[in-house]
Amino acid sequence: MTITPQQLIAMLPLLIVGLTVVVVMLSIAWRRDHFINATLTVIGLNLALLSLYFVGQVGPMDVTPLMRVDGYSMFYTGLVIIASLATSTFAYPWLVGYPDNREEFYLLVLIAALGGILLASANHLASLFLGIELLTLPLFGLIGYAYRQKRSLEASIKYMLLSAAASSFLLFGMALLYAESGSLSFVGLGQSLSDSMVHQPLILAGLGMMIVGLGFKLSLVPFQLWTPDVYQGAPAPVSTFLATASKIAIFAVVMRLFMYAPAADSEAVRLVLSIIAVASILFGNLMAISQTNIKRLLGYSSIAHLGYLLIALVAVQTHELALPLETIGVYLAGYLFSSLGAFGVVSLMSSPYKGPDAESLFSYRGLFWHKPILSAVMTVMMLSLAGIPMTLGFIGKFFVVAMGVSANLWWLTGAVVLGSAIGLYYYLRVTVSLFLSPPQSLVRDTPSNWALTAGGVVVLISAILVLVLGIYPQPLITLVQMAQPLM
């Protein structure tokens, strides 16, 4: 098969990030320089982000049988690259105090970003699996990067063992689907899995196993047990990547699979997804109430957020595609910027070897009296995650509720409202502790000029975006409406 210039342009983000991986590798081999490698990484990711403009000019197409580049894949590629950029900028000050090799961190982030970009345009079960593995394997190394701390190493081992088990479930599920349908591409699966076939035991078993594998990666109940431990043990910049890029990329590919394959029409599959969604919303929110560690709290809250999103998957079948797709785009954009801001503040407050990460809620007590702007940012992020009006998080929640109502999913909509009410409590708990009187004994190691560091700039931009798009969301909604998949 000959590749035309148009197809090369359509693959630009993948090619640029892949090239950056090679350049950073050679640069590490030539001379270890933390600053140079961090700069190369950021330049490469920015070029990949800019290249999306040219990708948009060539129009939607199937580049290879494995990849379909369209507005949908461009939107999620953009989100993944933004998350990777933020991770790299948060990691720089964190790594400055790190005694061992620092440069490999950026290499792992780039490889994981490559997996995320592949997932955003995956159109075939092979590229789905390749993308998920490319995304997960570097995460083992990233989670255990501060391996001299017992917690980080333990988190890495937990994630690795469970992830391997989940991947094997996923592969076996794919094998069963292939055995029954004889096709691995999403569109081919959609054509061969006609309504009569969905009820065959092999197909249902295959779908069930794929739900287990993907549910683990998205940390949905009951496959969520690793989430709080890993979020807590991983370095703060890595938790950022785990909460944003990996979840967004995998959710994007699951959504695409559901659009093409009518497995969605099966009542059994929808029932299972509805139960998982309600369980995730309630479990995530209820468990977060008692947490005193902010990373664990954000870990549990991410379980709940993916529960809200799962409702869009259930609504895909009952409804035309436009509203669920818009909902997912708006919600994930809001979730991305809110999480980047929240984890960014945690990263700015933590440094690897000056005592433990500032993760306990106690270390945020009275932060307002020392760092008023930083605590204002944290407040905005918490309100956005809770879905308070005038923030981007509210627009996302509003779309979810509107979609649930229009698809007549009353139970699920009720669960969203209930979950948001519970969520309000623990998000406000974090916010209130920022404004209490500060304890005497606490030493803070945030740099006094944090707003001038790269990480500080990312956090401030996230806060501004969350507020501006929360008040006037039209630009984002227009962008999401343009990001339609090629059917």
UniProtKB/Swiss-Prot annotation:
Protein name per Swiss-Prot or TrEMBL: NADH-quinone oxidoreductase subunit N
**InterPro entries associated with the record:** NADH-Q_OxRdtase_suN/2 (IPR010096), ND/Mrp_TM (IPR001750)
Q: Give the membrane topology, semicolon-separated if more than one.
A: Multi-pass membrane protein
* Record bears the keyword Transmembrane helix: yes
Q: NCBIfam families of this UniProt entry?
A: NDH_I_N, PRK05777.1-1
Q: Which UniProt keywords apply?
A: Cell inner membrane, Cell membrane, Membrane, NAD, Quinone, Translocase, Transmembrane, Transmembrane helix, Transport, Ubiquinone
Which Pfam family, giving just one, matches this sequence? Answer: Proton_antipo_M
Question: EC number(s) of the enzyme?
Answer: 7.1.1.-
* Species of origin: Yersinia pestis
| TM annotation in the entry | 8-28, 35-55, 78-98, 104-124, 125-145, 159-179, 203-223, 235-255, 271-291, 297-317, 328-348, 376-396, 409-428, 451-471
May I have one GO cellular component term?
plasma membrane
Q: Record's family?
A: Belongs to the complex I subunit 2 family.
